[in-house]
């Protein structure tokens, strides 16, 4: 993947526009989870250190486009950045007709979704963004799969368009896991529905030596093997699709499971063979033998791609399967990459973040990259690198 990298450029004295992913949860005017801002800080600090005139922006939430709404302001992000940086930081609300930035100062441009035409990748808006800078830095992998004015359009018109360190690292890590993985390559796809992950399963079945399925997805595969899944979440209309995948790829389907008669945090768990699931029971986790089998597979892997838990890990009684799998990934010597909201929550819960080789910041973008789709922002950066 050939793109210009921000780290290859001299930014001294240049007006630098960084499109970061600062879309963080905010409650009562305070940032409640700072992971995305923390991930973006090194990029901002590097540009400031080089003596650039730095502007950074992002979307936050889903405001009505073209209207200012205090609820979706980047002000809480600005206050957070003021605490973390020694440089002056200020928020600018009206910037489309130009903004003055001093060297060593960080200007946060208000929520891009307050600008009409942002989501539609409007050309006039894109040109206005581009006129603000000498160098455009795309560093928001989480929105790279959307062609919008601040992620894609601006890059077509800016003098220079490059990938920020976060985006570059993300592309390198995903490339390493998917393009020429060290083998055996094991992929884990969890989640509730086969339908939402079908393309991912399809793509990975062609790359992975073993494809581990978990959650509601695994239930559809258990049904495909002719077992009764009781009241479990599964998709009857995709059983044939699961059967097809079972013939094209090595998919270890659970042999034992944990079940309950209701979907609740306090429901007691019963461990049993997949042959014995009753009509009034639902599968909420994989069993111990299945979890150990997966741990063994992961122990021998050289590359692991992890997207989704293998059970309802939010409920303590149905956490064990995901915990065993998570710890097996953490203990493995494989190159491991993890992505997706539930996966990140599991990594936090089991405290293994420092044992995963690379944690992806993108949800939808991560999945689309895995599916082999072209990410518009990345395609634009590749195009600009040729000029």
Curated annotation (Swiss-Prot):
Q: What is its EC number?
A: 2.7.2.3
Q: Is Acetylation set as a keyword in this record?
A: yes
Residue ranges that the Swiss-Prot or TrEMBL entry lists as coiled coil: none
Q: How would you summarize the oligomeric state and partners of this protein?
A: Monomer.
- What's a GO cellular component annotated to this UniProt protein? cytosol
Give binding positions for ATP: 197, 314, 340-343
Give the record's pathway.
Answer: Carbohydrate degradation; glycolysis; pyruvate from D-glyceraldehyde 3-phosphate: step 2/5
What is the protein's given name? Phosphoglycerate kinase
Where does it localize? Cytoplasm
Q: Which family does it belong to?
A: Belongs to the phosphoglycerate kinase family.
Annotated GO biological processes are: gluconeogenesis; glycolytic process
Instruction: Provide the binding site for substrate.
Output: 21-23, 36, 59-62, 113, 146
Catalysed reactions listed for this entry: (2R)-3-phosphoglycerate + ATP = (2R)-3-phospho-glyceroyl phosphate + ADP
Output the superkingdom of the source species.
Bacteria
Q: Which InterPro entries match?
A: Phosphoglycerate_kinase, Phosphoglycerate_kinase_CS, Phosphoglycerate_kinase_N, Phosphoglycerate_kinase_sf
- Give the Gene Ontology MF terms in alphabetical order: ADP binding; ATP binding; guanosine tetraphosphate binding; phosphoglycerate kinase activity
Residue list for modification N6-acetyllysine: 84
Q: Which UniProt keywords apply?
A: Acetylation, ATP-binding, Cytoplasm, Glycolysis, Kinase, Nucleotide-binding, Transferase
């Amino acid at each position: 993947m050939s793109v210009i990298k921000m780290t290859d450029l001299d930014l001294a004295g240049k007006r630098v526009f960084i499109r970061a992913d600062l879309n963080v949860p905010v409650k009562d005017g305070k940032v409640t989870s700072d992971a995305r801002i923390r991930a973006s800080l090194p990029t901002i600090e590097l540009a400031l250190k080089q003596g650039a005139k730095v502007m950074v922006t992002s979307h936050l939430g889903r405001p009505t486009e073209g209207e200012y709404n205090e609820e979706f302001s980047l002000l809480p992000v600005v206050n957070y950045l003021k605490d973390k940086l020694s440089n002056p930081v200020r928020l600018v609300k009206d910037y489309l007709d130009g903004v003055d930035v001093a060297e060593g100062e960080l200007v946060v441009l208000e929520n891009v979704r307050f600008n009409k035409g942002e989501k539609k990748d409007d050309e006039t808006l894109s040109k206005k963004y581009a006129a603000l800078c000498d160098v455009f830095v795309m560093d928001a992998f989480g929105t790279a799969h959307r062609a919008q004015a601040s992620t894609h359009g601006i890059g077509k018109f800016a003098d220079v368009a490059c990938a920020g360190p976060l985006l570059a690292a993300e592309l390198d890590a995903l490339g390493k896991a998917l393009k020429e993985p060290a083998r055996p390559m094991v992929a884990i796809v969890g989640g509730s529905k086969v339908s939402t992950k079908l393309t991912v399963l399809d793509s990975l079945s062609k790359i992975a030596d073993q494809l581990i399925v978990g959650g509601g997805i695994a239930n559809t595969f258990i049904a495909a093997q002719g077992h009764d899944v009781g009241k479990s979440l599964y998709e009857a209309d995709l059983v044939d699709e699961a059967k097809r995948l079972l013939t094209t790829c090595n998919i270890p389907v659970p042999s034992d499971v944990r079940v309950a008669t209701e979907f609740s945090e306090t429901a007691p768990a019963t461990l049993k063979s997949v042959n014995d699931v009753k009509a009034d029971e639902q599968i909420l986790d994989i069993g111990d033998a299945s979890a150990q089998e997966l741990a063994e597979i992961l122990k021998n892997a050289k590359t692991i791609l992890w997207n989704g838990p293998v059970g309802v890990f939010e409920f303590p009684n149905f956490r064990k399967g995901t915990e065993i799998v998570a710890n097996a990934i953490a203990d493995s010597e494989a190159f491991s990459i993890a992505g997706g909201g539930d996966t990140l929550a599991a990594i936090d819960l089991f405290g293994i973040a420092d044992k995963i080789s690379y944690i992806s910041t993108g949800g939808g973008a991560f999945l689309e990259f895995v599916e082999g789709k072209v990410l518009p922002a990345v395609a634009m950066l590749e195009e600009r690198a040729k000029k």
